[in-house]
Amino acid sequence: MNELEFVTKHRRHLHQHPELSLHEFETTAYIKAFLDSLNIKYDCPLETGVIAYLEGNGSHTIAYRADIDALPILEENDVPYRSQSDHVMHACGHDGHTTALMLFVQRCKDMQDAGQLPQNVVFIFQPAEETGGGANRLIKAGAFDKYPIEAVFGIHVNPFADEGIAVIRDEEITASATEYRFFLTGLSSHVADKEQAHSCGEALQHVLTQISQIQQFHLNGLKRNIVHIGHFKAGEAINTVPSNGYLEGTIRTYDIDDLTIVKNQMHKIAESVKLLFNVECEVKFAEGYPPTINSPKLRTQIEDALIKADLNVYDKPTPFLFGEDFSFYGQQLAPAYFVFIGTRNEDKGFVTGLHTSHLNFDEKALINVVNFYENLLNNYKEV
């Protein structure tokens, strides 16, 4: 089959069989079977995900990463290859990322068989990008200890950029993503005896107000930050004073100092609630993803490889405000660079955003990704 047939076949199979983070068992088996068909050795440091390796002629080792997990979303696309899993969908394009890396593996194996693979290549089929921090898990498991990786590259489909456009940015390209949760415990009473209670309802109102003011009064207005309240609840019945309260949300920032400011303010809010309302209040933070930092040292190689792949380069002036665990590779493993590949096509109706029930794209965009990957490999220079 030709390459367009290859990416169409594999991407649509993966699209029909999405799996959630840390449960990508069938996806992992599918990738392993593909690698076995090429007689390529691989490791599985975690229960899901695969790390493959090909030895080239050069002394350098570079890595390429694709995430393989899906989202808990009910697909609404009316296509023959729609998800066969109830309320699970590849709504972030990871089926495309995985397919592109599979085709790149095929090309690299062909080059190796011909004695023309220029450098050593590590292929990272990574689980749990959406939740679970799969990149960090792999690094902590020692998955890359035996590879002297010098650079890590990755891509993400971007339905807000037209086909044929590649979006890049040096330094911060995506924000940190940190979840926070407030837990309030007070004393309930009948509403007729509310003076005897310690109301978590009133306390929660205070928390809501104070959180909403963090962005306005404590963060630089020229920087892009999000302090989002996603869900809150107090009490159980209409005629009782709430004895409990709960609030959760997410923080998005590309500046670690700003994240520290937000966390400190939230701790102060929790302490103020205790004093003002005589209720217990605790704030907890889930381990988030740090900002994805693109190494400027790799910029020239990235841009040249994209242009040679017939992609138009757009230099984004500000970072995206969503999180991405590719960030761990640049933070802990090696200089890294993350590129967004445009997939928007209004004529074909491919216009909806990531994490939506109608996300779709033309598989031919994946050929450009593989051309970009190959150009990077053929012209790689140590940084």
From Swiss-Prot:
GO molecular-function annotation terms? Answer: hydrolase activity
Q: What does the record give as EC number?
A: 3.-.-.-
- The enzyme class is hydrolase
- Which key words tag this protein in UniProt? Hydrolase
The record ties this protein, via Pfam families, to: M20_dimer, Peptidase_M20
Q: Which family does it belong to?
A: Belongs to the peptidase M20 family.
NCBIfam families to which the protein is assigned, alphabetical: amidohydrolases
Protein name from the UniProt record = Uncharacterized hydrolase SA1230
Q: Which organism is it from?
A: Staphylococcus aureus (strain N315)
Q: What is the lineage of its organism?
A: Bacteria, Bacillati, Bacillota, Bacilli, Bacillales
